[in-house]
Amino acid sequence: MMAKKVYNHDDGVRLARYRDDFEHASVYGKWRLCWKSKDLENHAHKVYAIYSYGSHFPMYVWDELSGQWLGNSDKYSRTTSTHQSKYRPSEVAKWFGTAELCSIIDCGLVGYITNRMEQGLPVS
């Protein structure tokens, strides 16, 4: 599916609420296929991520399997903080740092938790 070009944040926020792919000059949202899910090898698992100024800073992630919004607790810039406020979903189940949220995009929430447990790391 091709991302819808939007020219104002209000349209972007509306599309993000419906988890539609969109592109704005500084914010975009798109579905991603989780590719590192060992525990879900035979199942298609997707997440919807909303980014500010590139894929290095995901603001929010919808995990399709758990049916939850996950948020980025880190701050990046004043403009990105404005984006985080504007695009914030009505309910965020859990907050993660940028690196953790990027890992969740790669393998989904279940894959992320499984990987942490296998490495003997705490799951908070």
Go through each PLM region and give its residues.
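Terminal leader/tail segments of proteins
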Residues: M1-S124
